[in-house]
Amino acid sequence: MRFAIVVTGPAYGTQQASSAFQFAQALIAEGHELSCVFFYREGVYNANQLTSPASDEFDLVRGWQQLNAQHGVALNICVAAALRRGIVDETEAGRLGLASSNLQSGFTLSGLGALAEASLTCDRVVQF
């Protein structure tokens, strides 16, 4: 089966993102296709490269990045939600006159069209 995941919780502070990550790993281990992960609302904090968890905690932001690098899973970040929460790529930082960007590599700013496309092309969309 082909899946898409929607993450609406931040990397830390709630269970949503870590549960979504574990679900993503289980899908791949069972031979399913994970087309994309769409980060929405507070979920966009999963793409902040400035996140620095304690040394004894799992680095969820880097975990998502590895999922992208190893399995080609698209990591789409809602651009409107990201900009409202201070998550920007180099292009947006330049356009907005900001000193720097903080979007972790492997993540892509995208619109809700990416979520709509995933809904149309995947067998299941699971929200966390």
From Swiss-Prot:
Pfam families of this UniProt entry?
DsrE
- Extract the GO molecular function terms from the UniProt entry: sulfur carrier activity; sulfurtransferase activity
Which GO cellular component does the record give, naming just one? sulfurtransferase complex
Q: Carries keyword Coiled coil? A: no
Write the record's keywords in alphabetical order, separated by commas: Cytoplasm, Transferase, tRNA processing
What is the annotated localization of this protein? Cytoplasm
E.C. number(s) listed in UniProt? 2.8.1.-
Residues of the active site: C78
Provide the GO biological process annotations: tRNA wobble position uridine thiolation
On assembly, the entry states: Heterohexamer, formed by a dimer of trimers. The hexameric TusBCD complex contains 2 copies each of TusB, TusC and TusD. The TusBCD complex interacts with TusE.
Q: Which family does it belong to?
A: Belongs to the DsrE/TusD family.
- What's the stated role of this polypeptide? Part of a sulfur-relay system required for 2-thiolation of 5-methylaminomethyl-2-thiouridine (mnm(5)s(2)U) at tRNA wobble positions. Accepts sulfur from TusA and transfers it in turn to TusE.
Q: Which HAMAP family match?
A: Thiourid_synth_D (MF_00390)
Q: Output this protein's name.
A: Sulfurtransferase TusD
